[in-house]
Amino acid sequence: MVVVTDVDLVVDFLNTVDHEAHTDVLSDPDAWRRWLTDRGLADSADARAVRTALRAAVGDPLEEAAGAAVPVTVELPAGGAPRLAATDVAGAVLAAASRLAVLGQWGRVKICPADDCRWAFYDRSRNHSRTWCSMQACGNREKARAWRSARR
């Protein structure tokens, strides 16, 4: 099983749809089962709705804003601090997103604005100004496109 941080879980879940490659892990039962198994999570009937809502929440222009609600619990381990817990992937992802929001890190989860990409990424820049999933790929391509357009 892969050790997954909240950032990894949220970003990996958002990227279960790849618009550039035209693939969707949720539509491939074997790939989805592997994805869940690698993270030690159970399936959820709400997975697609949660992904759509989260992608809209972080700025995917092609996803319509929608709410999503799934059950989570608050656990209080002996001698520990309260924590959100979930029994399936939808709850685990929303619990992870909630922890990011509480820590003030939710705004760092972004969607690449390149029309042919729309990959989710976590902005680790000091001033939260990263725009592209990768400056070497999408950023360079978009800047070159803008430069060519301006030269015409």
Protein language model features and the residues they cover:
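Short helix-coil boundary/hinge micro-motifs
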Residues: 1-111, 115-122
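Hydrophobic face of beta-strands forming the core of extended beta-sheets/solenoids
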Residues: 112, 133-134
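Short linker/helix segments within small regulatory modules
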Residues: 123-130
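Basic DNA-binding region of bZIP-type proteins
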Residues: 128, 135-152
